[in-house]
């Protein structure tokens, strides 16, 4: 938490999606850090210690979003992690969620209101 606001790290190799997430999350009252790669996301995680992380499943580096989640765990992450996916059926996504210890997986295009509800719940907020 910085300046009384929760900090959310968003990691996606699509700049348009990152900007949309940043704008929507800022409007909802959250501070955001963004990263265009898994490697940059890991660096920003170490620098900022965010309260929650949102990452894309399909990124080029560190074996995509799942690799990032594994690297975050090795770096001591205890923040909730939400994964964004444009691939896979619910069974595959469900298996990945259990295996990686993810807090939630959202299919693209993301229903932002549903994601916001999950973010609030994971951060222990009401509303």
Describe each region flagged by the PLM.
Residues 1-7, 113-127:
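Non-catalytic signal-transmission and effector/linker regions of two-component phosphorelay proteins
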Residues 5-16, 21-25:
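Conserved acidic segment of CheY-like receiver
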Residues 11-12, 35, 53:
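Conserved sequence signature across two-component system core domains
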Residues 34-43, 64-65:
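Helix N-cap/capping motif at the beta->alpha junctions
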Residues 46-48, 71-78, 100:
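Conserved phosphotransfer cores of two-component systems
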Residues 56-57:
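Active-site residues of response regulator receiver
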Residues 63-67, 74, 88-106, 114-117:
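Alpha4 helix (beta4-alpha4-beta5 surface) of REC/receiver domains from two-component response regulators
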Residues 84-85:
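Hydrophobic/aromatic residues positioned on beta-strands within the core alpha/beta folds
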């Amino acid at each position: 938490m910085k300046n009384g606001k929760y900090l959310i790290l968003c990691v996606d190799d699509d700049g348009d999606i990152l900007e949309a997430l940043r704008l929507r999350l800022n409007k909802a009252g959250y501070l955001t850090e963004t990263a265009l790669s898994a490697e940059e996301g890991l660096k920003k995680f170490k620098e900022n210690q965010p309260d929650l992380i949102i990452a894309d499943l399909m990124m080029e580096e560190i074996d995509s979003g799942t690799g990032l989640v594994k690297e975050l765990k090795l770096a001591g992450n205890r923040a909730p992690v939400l994964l964004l996916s444009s691939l896979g059926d619910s069974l595959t996504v469900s298996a990945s969620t259990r295996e990686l210890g993810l807090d939630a997986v959202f299919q693209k295009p993301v229903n932002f209101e549903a994601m916001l509800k999950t973010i609030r719940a994971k951060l222990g907020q009401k509303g």
